[in-house]
Swiss-Prot record:
Lineage, uppermost ranks: Bacteria, Bacillati, Actinomycetota, Actinomycetes, Mycobacteriales
Annotated segments matching region G3: 536-539
Gene3D superfamilies xref list: 1.10.10.2480, P-loop containing nucleotide triphosphate hydrolases, Translation factors, Translation initiation factor IF- 2, domain 3
Source species, domain of life: Bacteria
Protein name: Translation initiation factor IF-2
Family, per entry: Belongs to the TRAFAC class translation factor GTPase superfamily. Classic translation factor GTPase family. IF-2 subfamily.
Primary location recorded for the protein, binned into one broad class: cytoplasm
Biased composition (Low complexity): 64-87, 112-121, 146-165, 270-279
Gene: infB
Biological function: One of the essential components for the initiation of protein synthesis. Protects formylmethionyl-tRNA from spontaneous hydrolysis and promotes its binding to the 30S ribosomal subunits. Also involved in the hydrolysis of GTP during the formation of the 70S ribosomal complex.
Residue segments, region G2: 511-515
Places the protein is found: Cytoplasm
Organism, scientific name: Rhodococcus erythropolis (strain PR4 / NBRC 100887)
Molecular function GO labels: GTP binding; GTPase activity; translation initiation factor activity
Amino acid sequence: MAGKARVHELAKELGVTSKELLATLKEQGEFVKSASSTVEAPVARRLRESFPSAGGAETKSETGAAAPAARPAAKPGAPSPSAAKPGGPRPGPKPAAPAPAAPAAPAPAAPAAPAAAAPAAPSAPVPTPTFNAPKPAQPARPAPAAPAASAPAAPAAPAAPSTGAKPGGPRPGPKAPRVGNNPYSSAPAERPAPRPAPGAPRPGAGQGGSRPAPGQGGPRPAPGQGGPRPAPGQGGPRPAPGQGGPRPPAGQGGPRPSPGSMPPRPNPGAMPARSARPAPGGGGRPGRPGGAPGGRPGGGGGGYRGGGAPGAGAGAGAPGGAAPAGGFRGRPGGGGRPGQRGAAAGAFGRPGGAVRRGRKSKRAKRAEYESMQAPAVGGVRLPRGNGETIRLARGASLSDFADKIDANPAALVQALFNLGEMVTATQSVNDETLELLGGEMNYVVQVVSPEDEDRELLDSFDLTYGEDAGGEEDLESRPPVVTVMGHVDHGKTRLLDVIRKANVREGEAGGITQHIGAYQVLTELEGNERLVTFIDTPGHEAFTAMRARGAKATDLAILVVAADDGVMPQTVEAINHAQAADVPIVVAVNKIDKEGANPDKIRQQLTEYGLVAEEYGGDTMFVDISAKQGLNIDALLEAVLLTADASLDLRANPDMDAQGVAIEAHLDRGRGPVATVLIQRGTLRVGDSIVAGDAYGRVRRMVDEHGQDVHEALPSRPVQVIGFTSVPGAGDNLLVVDEDRIARQIADRRNARKRNALAAKSRKRISLDDLDAALKEHSQLNLILKGDNSGTVEALEEALLGIPIDDEVQLRVIDRGVGGITETNVNLAAASNAIIIGFNVRAEGKATELANREGVDIRYYSVIYQAIDEVEKALKGLLKPVYEEVELGKAEIRAMFRSSKIGNIAGCLVTSGSIRRNAKARLIRDSKVIAETVTISSLKREKEDATEVREGYECGLTVTYSDIKIGDVLECYELREKPRD
């Protein structure tokens, strides 16, 4: 093979499939993509060595090629056919009944000699003129004790007809019977079964007419023609070993037996039970049993189609239609039993005889039984489970489900369609639909939570998150992480400003915190300087996720409550977050310097939520402070450190790979994606390969809260990390891995999982019931959100999706991101008819010009509740208008006039309100509504057209309802749009 070998070429050479060869290559550690890929020469050599069957196949093919070559060579190579035949006694015209005189001498030797000749037939080319040898014997009874003299006689008999006899005159039976093929050479009672061997015919089963006369035989083959055998049942396979052996070459047969040497014909009473049954082919009487003088077997049965029993037309006992010692060519349909040896199809179809159905295997029966038990949904057969649990990721498709249960995805699609759900095979499906489909098939579908799925993902890379490596001796103390929580405007950021001696509050829009910040400050306790890490969380209701995130990443929480305001909804929510995270709480009662402040009231209110002050016998420390005046700030810090030392084990291993959490992230114009990361364990260094959520990268730079570069960050240290390829999500776990390749693979798989889950969540389920409504035009508000950091975008999206609106209107966030508004966002908005909301960001470059040209609406906000209010108003504007009915007046019909052009004209008196032309009216008769919607088509006052007639005036009018009578009342009304609340 020139050049490199391809996989499919090697598979063809080795006699295996390409799939098997690919599996072998995979086991050997070779990466081959497909069957058309090439492999190197050493690999190909190893493959040839690993498949020994290839060599065996070659040897087998060589042997098989040699065998046919040797076989025809023997025929012309036997020079003695003509010499051998005259040497033996050859019967002339056969007498009518020579059988009774001859059988005495050869009968005893008949059973043993041919049976022993079968195994020795190929090795005995020299014929022996023994008259006992050609007698047919039972093909299935080997006799090991046969005399050796009988062995060379076996091939002698059938060899004669292949070359033909020299003397002239056609003879019907020029061939001697084959040794071992006469089923009647021994007593029939010795046969254990009617069919001695799979390919052998039943004795006497051939349907035949009368035997031809001695001189009426067909033309014998010309001398020297040793090729085709004029066997009646030719085309059947050679008999198996033990059934007479292979046919010897022509010209090596013994002398033709005389009539006196033939065994007596058995009487019908000695026949086997099944031999007397007519052949399945039908159409003629059963063939003669054979064994007549001259060695001619029974003839073929009558009937053209299917011509008799298996083996019809063959010699008596010839296995599977093999050439007999004599007789004419059999009728069509000859051959062995259908489905067995000798059952080759001929020009007239399959061999004759009734078709017998084979027995089903256990596997086939099992498959049929399981298909009967399989559930059918709408005519679709589905696999049946036994209550097995199938684990699927959130947002999995039907193809994923089908792979788990080894089913056809198309069947699952059709089954869901019959259940009323329209999905495709690759579409992300929500959890309820997967559970519904699994229940129909008796499977328990378990949707894996994102946490478990992420844990399994990390386990596949031999990574763990959340545990310190090493033992107790490797742990070192670390600073506590404190989160400041509370209601909006209760003074959380002002408290942090006092602690940090900075002013962050003035920089926040609207005076409320819309970001989550992390700082590390140095404080003093009992003469020792201690580091404390503070995390500031927003108090606005839209930032619930931020507060929950801050509670999870913290060791201790400071709950700020205004003394003049009391416990508020976000205060309760902050308490719940802290208690859910099992975080101890220190309560700071702020604004005690204001009038109306009542710290005792705060203590009483918080008692209802499980925060009992120490002075009330509890274990929660309360500190009264004033962030504005700076009162008791040191006492608050001391309480924080005391609580942390008393109830927390603040230790971590700084020598392991860093693990942490991304508190917030944003896109900086000059630095790219920037994430504020809190290190929880290990040490983060510049140059480490990191992955956080679906973002990955390498640490290029780290900056602390003061803008100073940091080369390594120890546990409990908040830093800004620069070097991500994309903006990570707020709250994503940060992990250091060995190399960038692993980080990229983890990020890509997380991104795919997130995308599938989002697709399953955002796509509305369309059932067959509401298909008509779904196809109609419906109102939908598409939004594109851009913000200054990921936490704000997340909070804004959750707040907008939580707006209570009617089902008639849908709110869909088609894109979200961190950073300025780009031209790509504008193009997407123009294509999807969306509105762009920029939160603390502006349009970049020519995005504004493109938006004006495309007619895209861009809204800028700096306070989150303003964005929520305006989007809510826009959604309510998309709702279908709600109308209310306003009564205009009533008119009583006093007279009726008939006009050939117009029809009925009603003369009315307006009893109340006014009547207007083209207004809607209700026809009332005897206090019953006759017509609900009637339009006043024309209105006249005297002979002049009028648009309105007031109370007390008469008028003439026509309506779009003909059945009006005197005394009817027309109640006129109009529909006015009702403003929504």
